Amino acid sequence: MSNSVVHNLLNRGLIRPLNFEHQNKLNSSVYQTSTANPALGKIGRSKLYGKGLKQAGRSLVTETGGRPLSFVPRAVLAMDPQAAEKFSLDGNIDLLVEVTSTTVREVNIQIAYTSDTLFLHWGAILDNKENWVLPSRSPDRTQNFKNSALRTPFVKSGGNSHLKLEIDDPAIHAIEFLIFDESRNKWYKNNGQNFHINLPTERNVKQNVSVPEDLVQIQAYLRWERKGKQMYNPEKEKEEYEAARTELREEMMRGASVEDLRAKLLKKDNSNESPKSNGTSSSGREEKKKVSKQPERKKNYNTDKIQRKGRDLTKLIYKHVADFVEPESKSSSEPRSLTTLEIYAKAKEEQETTPVFSKKTFKLEGSAILVFVTKLSGKTKIHVATDFKEPVTLHWALSQKGGEWLDPPSDILPPNSLPVRGAVDTKLTITSTDLPSPVQTFELEIEGDSYKGMPFVLNAGERWIKNNDSDFYVDFAKEEKHVQKDYGDGKGTAKHLLDKIADLESEAQKSFMHRFNIAADLVDEAKSAGQLGFAGILVWMRFMATRQLVWNKNYNVKPREISKAQDRLTDLLQDVYASYPEYRELLRMIMSTVGRGGEGDVGQRIRDEILVIQRKNDCKGGIMEEWHQKLHNNTSPDDVVICQALMDYIKSDFDLSVYWKTLNDNGITKERLLSYDRAIHSEPNFRGEQKDGLLRDLGHYMRTLKAVHSGADLESAIQNCMGYQDDGEGFMVGVQINPVSGLPSGYPDLLRFVLEHVEEKNVEPLLEGLLEARQELRPLLLKSHDRLKDLLFLDLALDSTVRTAIERGYEQLNDAGPEKIMYFISLVLENLALSSDDNEDLIYCLKGWQFALDMCKSKKDHWALYAKSVLDRSRLALASKAERYLEILQPSAEYLGSCLGVDQSAVSIFTEEIIRAGSAAALSSLVNRLDPVLRKTANLGSWQVISPVEVVGYVIVVDELLTVQNKTYDRPTIIVANRVRGEEEIPDGAVAVLTPDMPDVLSHVSVRARNGKICFATCFDSGILSDLQGKDGKLLSLQPTSADVVYKEVNDSELSSPSSDNLEDAPPSISLVKKQFAGRYAISSEEFTSDLVGAKSRNIGYLKGKVPSWVGIPTSVALPFGVFEKVISEKANQAVNDKLLVLKKTLDEGDQGALKEIRQTLLGLVAPPELVEELKSTMKSSDMPWPGDEGEQRWEQAWAAIKKVWASKWNERAYFSTRKVKLDHDYLCMAVLVQEVINADYAFVIHTTNPSSGDSSEIYAEVVKGLGETLVGAYPGRSLSFICKKNNLDSPLVLGYPSKPIGLFIRRSIIFRSDSNGEDLEGYAGAGLYDSVPMDEEDQVVLDYTTDPLITDLSFQKKVLSDIARAGDAIEKLYGTAQDIEGVIRDGKLYVVQTRPQV
């Protein structure tokens, strides 16, 4: 209708104005008046409306009368491929009809009138037909009216009513309708006739209308601009170009001339130009658009390889890591109360004399079924219990194989049993003794092993209770390796949140929509619980994703409802990701298990598209119909696998084994297909002529499925970010995804490069492209973005593709040299660092690999030795990450798994599977490939022998040496320990410790091994280690050399060999002289004597003034022997002393837990005023800073450090060590050496006789960055080690480069060193047993060795190492015996902080 007509009608007051959304888009010739269509004059023949409807010319009237209105429609050219027509009913009611005239044919009808009983009475017109037909697709609540018309109710919206029809049958070329208000019995017509709406058809479009190519190019460009300048592949480019041609043909069919189109397009195009270009001539602009058909592309990448950008790797460091905090809420500390069933089961298990063979809990709504099996002497006992409130009958049988029901023998039937055909009905026995509520039970005992299982279902009244539409089944042939445990306390978890999840699981299992909405509701609570809250959500979602939880139970849900719930959850997770950087790694993992979700249209496509596939390919029955029903009922990630299995089946020329292989490889069995609410019974059985069409359509459908279910699918993720439009087909809804804004320049080309190389055998270019894409994307992930979720899923997909690519590339590394393997390691490490919250150590490992690669390419000496240190550090980083995951995730997995009845085997390996799913597993595999290559190149061998002693003993395999350090073996034992930290004691009876771990040669455990004549060695070869572990319990002979360990199995007769006699040697006779308080609280170094201080203090005092001038000795004072005993005897400390006496008695009775309590108690000591004054005076007179000058708080820090040194007399290691050699612990006295801390650049330890070889002509030393505590304490990794001949001190030889990730640094401070009378006794190595405590906390710094001149500057390295060797040689000459020396280097100056005789 023209604007003039509307204006006239408004002025005449005949119609009420109505603001429709598209009222400015008036109709084209698609809409016609009744006289333009011959069918309209024959309404009477259709016998649809009765006799009262008569043709009344061209005026619009109603049956009940009304004012006629003249109506003359006009065709108006519209840019938009939609057309709209407005009518007036009764002279004052507006009616608007719009038709979408492109691929999707929709008829939108709006009327400015409302009624609860307003209907559209309608039908369709086929080609050259007059009578109505009923379309197969109609809106909800449509009714069939006498099989001759459809009646569809309008939907009210404000003061208007509206309705949308979707027409998918291409044979329909028009619809006709009337409007009927049932409550008023009133019909609205078009001048007494049907409203007749023509629909565009493919035939119309394909008429031979010629459109100039230059106009098609401009239209294609404008379409591309409208759709957000998306990235198109060649196929999509062609499709868009032809769509542009079709749009222009349609306009010409409506009457537009070529000149009209040209004028309109050029005007439209000009509006997009800058003001500066508006003066360009028409012909110039036309020529410009001829070359603008597609967006310009920057060809940054050739077809073979990309050029990676140079980046400062330190800019990638990400330190947002959540502190591990145990929730402090009351609910977290309270143990979970056992359920009635758990109490019953616990009591039953205690009654049984045999361990539980298998145990399982089936969770039902509001109740549960517990089944456990025990076996003894050929008898199998089955226990079934349930907490159902109403009486229950067990309908059961026995089976010899899965799926069968066999009549049980009559002589084994329990009481209240009634045999029925092929089964038995047994009424359960009600038990309530000592239980909070009644339990119904069943017990069965079977002789022999002829039966393998027991199928059953329950009957309660009129209800049959099954296991998700399948029978329950008790398997008593297969023993559970991990019988489900009860983790009732929930320690280390967000227990309150996990309890809530467990309570809501019965609701969550109804459908994915329920589960995702419940998870979304819990996000705020998870946020409050912190890291452990999101760990709980991850565990729950991971149990879901791995099919440990029920996906759908008695509930139908539309795909669009699932995708909407997904969308809600992932939107919330996206918001948390943006606001809480410390949880990002966990959130990434949660999102990868949930999937992306999408707006309703994306989910709806799952439902619509399968119908189109069935119709187009003539496969409406069998598996396609069953799958269609499942998809409509409750789509899930299984559908991605089913779709892939169908495509693989078709590609294999319909080989059913291929179909089943794809399903089974992805965890879908026949039983699972049958377990769906809409079960899939049939196997595929397609015809040859269906092959091409199904492959094409299922391939397109896979994209729809992955868009909802597969967050980490690369192609889907790229499309979501680059944007795409899919107009659908027939009745399918269209989908338009706009491109993400703000992507880096050239990014589409980079992603196109990735897609083009994603399946190539040579994975190196692909890996480079993937990592470059992740690096380019990273800045956008670190700030807010309206499409952050899509960027995250793209990054997850790129990350996942790196992992799959590297696994595919293992084969090409089989014959590769170390340079290639190192490069691949650096790529995978980069990928892991980009996915980690706390990646500083990983980044420095990455820098180390790049430095090693440069050394290798330059063929520098020691490149392999240096690369080995980086490899060792990388292993440590992986181990640290695994331990972190274990600490955060495993407690939640165990607690929630117990609550939800998850299979124990899935719970026990939960964290392990999480790690395997990431880049860490690929990195570990590559490192293991490279290790033997580097060891061979660097001539390192398979062993490092720390204490070479020949021994014979029985092998025992343990995880950690720490767990057995206080054990006593009654026969010679060779311990193979996966983990040795360096601080442990070696247990009595052990003759050897073998480990893959790498404690320092000078660590406490190394010193103890050498002193105790115990063989101690590190094994670097995983094959040798596995062989040793396989000899658990066997008697072995070990024959170590300085670089190898030869071992063999021997007979018991060889136990008498001299080499193993050290086990029988009695501990040396050692005694301590108890020291007394000499009346002094503090003394200077000049007063150090054996009566007042230990060897540590005396040696420092002795060195002063005797060492070369270039060797510094720190100023020292001491709290002498007896001060501790004097302080604790003071009246002010009476309570502490009394408690100490009680705890010592407890300790003597064997309670080792008292040691920790003693140390804690001693921190309550009060310093006597005399001690404070005397220590202050002594320190100041020795030119040492007095802490109290900086405030009372600083003195309190110093006093706390002194007390910790005294308390270390009762640390576990020291206490058991003195017990082992039968020293009287009460006679052990502790002086405290007080020194100013030198904030070291490096710390070192020297042994002036090589401890590994015993060569006295050779100095051995180790150096670390920062303070020496990382060298002598239990800090992972190796230090820099070197040897130096005493006759050539200027030529140190590096044996190994450092792999310690952490260095300790401290402000100017004071350190309080333990100096007991039990250290350095002949025959007993007491050094290192007791603590030295600085008054300030050290700062832990992650080390970057690529910027350390000790590694990178060979001349600096030579000078520092030579100075250390010369200092050691000078001190040895001063004492005349081999020395164990500790020192530091600060600003090039060397200081010795202590020395003692080398053991």
UniProtKB/Swiss-Prot annotation:
It is an enzyme of class 2 (transferase). Residues 1-75 form a transit peptide. InterPro entries: ATP_grasp_subdomain_1, CWD_DUF7067, GWD-like_N_Ig, GWD1_pHisD, PPDK_AMP/ATP-bd. The keyword Repeat does not apply. It holds the Pfam family Ig_N_CWD1. Its main location: plastid. It is found in: Plastid, Chloroplast. Its EC number is 2.7.9.4. One of its GO terms (cellular component) is chloroplast envelope. Keywords: Acetylation, ATP-binding, Carbohydrate metabolism, Chloroplast, Kinase, Magnesium, Metal-binding, Nucleotide-binding, Plastid, Transferase, Transit peptide. The modification N-acetylvaline is found at residue 76. It comes from the Eukaryota. Residues 265-306 are annotated as: Disordered. Residues 284-306 have a biased composition (Basic and acidic residues). GO terms for biological process: cold acclimation; response to symbiotic fungus; starch catabolic process. The active site is at 1004 (tele-phosphohistidine intermediate). Its cofactor is Mg(2+). Homodimer. The N-terminal domain contains the alpha-glucan binding site, the central domain the pyrophosphate/phosphate carrier histidine, and the C-terminal domain the ATP binding site. The reaction takes place in three steps, mediated by a phosphocarrier histidine residue located on the surface of the central domain. The two first partial reactions are catalyzed at an active site located on the C-terminal domain, and the third partial reaction is catalyzed at an active site located on the N-terminal domain. For catalytic turnover, the central domain swivels from the concave surface of the C-terminal domain to that of the N-terminal domain. Belongs to the PEP-utilizing enzyme family. Acts as an overall regulator of starch mobilization. Required for starch degradation, suggesting that the phosphate content of starch regulates its degradability. This is Alpha-glucan water dikinase 1, chloroplastic. It comes from Arabidopsis thaliana (Mouse-ear cress).
